[in-house]
């Protein structure tokens, strides 16, 4: 039905957005509920200015709720009572924060209408009940998604071994391709592994099953659609050549991105200057070493540039050459550990965004010395250089900070997805997810 609606309305919904339909639905329901309670119930004599303030407050409410995990499905929690507890806790925290913010705004702008206890209780109860709909098991567990594999035994086993590492695997039923495929209307996916050897099977599928409710995909397309990443082992030369990896920097979309980089980085530099000053004082007090640390990084089209960070390691930590940070790295100072977790050490890089060496969102720039090794072992590594590097990116919000060749390869798979699927809305999602990571103190912590 969803596919039919897309055809009727000519909808071209991005891949990353399709997997977050529930999040968007509950986000907009929460937004509408907040505005209804704030503007309609118990309110009189609303002016345009008051409505505008209420709308801004509703956006902040939804952002706080997202950061606290109120729109999560809590899939990793099996016990429904634990899910309810998590949702209730997140709701109470969000209510407390928005209530405090409302009180602060009333002090600054006395003409505003305060939230009041009745409204805040009504918002909390009604919002909790609506959000609980997504975790209550109203229906039986849906049937597993069937995937029929076409390919030789090695290709099939390789694919199965690859997807077993993802939680998505539990919702799949992997089947061998057969000419006895059920012609039922249930959703099915036919995954074509390998290349030329499967031409007969491919022709048979298109001739006999194209009218059914199924997807016919390559592993490349399936991973992009379901994992929102492009694993390098499924990026064949054919797939590589079928897509134009050159970005038109003169297009309106990329000009808008650059305008946003300049505007937001300038504002953030001003707002974060007190934090940078306080952090600088703490760094100096701890070991009396230099405050800033400068590095050479590789940027757009392989051009090298210099970035500035707040120093988080002991002086002379790299006297034997650059190495990746490790978990519980003894080189990191006490203040440095906090700065890394909150990503405060990255704030001076806003200057690099302002001058055009970096973007707010994009692949993280790497050091030339480390890139020598990465390019030797990772195929298509230089593809990440077709766009400006960023302070945060799709890899950073989806994959823990890595410290190995394998981690770099996994991060590249997310970066290639970002390059192929770039949009203003995807940048906005990454920006919000970055705020969530920072608020949860999940900054630069290596996974090994």
Describe each region flagged by the PLM:
Residues 223-224, 230-233, 293-331, 392-413:
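Short, glycine-rich, amphipathic interfacial segments at transmembrane boundaries or analogous
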Residues 1-30, 133-270, 448:
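N-terminal hydrophobic signal-anchor/signal peptide
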Residues 1-140:
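Signature of alpha-helical transmembrane segments in polytopic membrane proteins
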Residues 84, 88, 256-263, 412:
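Hydrophobic alpha-helical elements at and bordering transmembrane segments
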């Amino acid at each position: 039905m969803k596919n039919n609606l897309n055809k009727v309305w000519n909808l071209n919904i991005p891949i990353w957005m399709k997997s977050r339909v529930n999040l968007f639905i509950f986000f907009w329901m929460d937004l509408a509920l907040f505005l209804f309670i704030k503007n309609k119930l118990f309110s009189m004599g609303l002016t345009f200015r008051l409505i505008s303030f209420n709308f801004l407050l509703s956006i902040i409410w939804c952002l706080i709720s997202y950061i606290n995990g109120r729109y999560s499905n809590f899939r990793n929690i099996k016990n429904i009572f634990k899910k309810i507890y998590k949702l209730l806790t997140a709701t109470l925290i969000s209510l407390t924060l928005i209530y405090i913010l409302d009180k602060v705004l009333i002090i600054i702008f006395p003409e505003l209408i305060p939230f009041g206890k009745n409204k805040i209780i009504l918002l909390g109860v009604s919002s909790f009940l609506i959000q609980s709909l997504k975790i209550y098991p109203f229906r039986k567990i849906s049937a597993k998604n069937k995937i029929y594999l076409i390919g030789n035994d090695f290709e099939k086993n390789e694919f199965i071994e690859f997807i077993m590492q993802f939680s998505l695997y539990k919702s799949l039923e992997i089947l061998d391709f057969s000419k006895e495929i059920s012609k039922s209307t249930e959703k099915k996916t036919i995954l074509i592994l390998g290349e030329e050897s499967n031409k007969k099977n491919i022709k048979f599928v298109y001739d006999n099953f194209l009218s059914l409710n199924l997807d016919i995909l390559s592993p490349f397309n399936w991973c992009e659609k379901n994992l929102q990443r492009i694993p390098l082992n499924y990026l064949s030369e054919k797939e590589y050549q079928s897509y134009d990896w050159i970005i038109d920097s003169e297009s309106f979309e990329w000009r808008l991105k650059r305008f946003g980089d300049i505007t937001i980085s300038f504002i953030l530099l001003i707002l974060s200057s007190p934090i940078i000053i306080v952090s600088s004082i703490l760094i100096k007090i701890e070991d009396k070493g230099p405050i800033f640390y400068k590095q050479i990084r590789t940027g757009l089209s392989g051009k090298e540039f210099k970035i500035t960070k707040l120093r988080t390691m002991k002086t002379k930590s790299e006297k034997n050459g650059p190495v990746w940070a490790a978990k519980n790295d003894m080189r990191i100072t006490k203040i440095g550990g906090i700065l890394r977790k909150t990503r405060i050490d990255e704030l001076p890089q806003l200057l690099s965004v302002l001058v055009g060496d970096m973007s707010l969102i994009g692949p993280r720039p790497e050091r030339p010395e480390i890139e020598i090794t990465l390019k030797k072992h990772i195929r298509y590594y230089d593809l990440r250089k077709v766009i400006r590097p960023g302070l945060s990116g799709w890899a950073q919000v989806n994959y823990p900070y890595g410290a190995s060749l394998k981690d770099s390869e996994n991060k590249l798979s997310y970066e290639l997805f970002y390059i192929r699927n770039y949009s203003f809305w995807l940048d906005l999602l990454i920006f919000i997810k970055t705020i969530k990571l920072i608020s949860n103190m999940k900054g630069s912590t290596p996974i090994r």
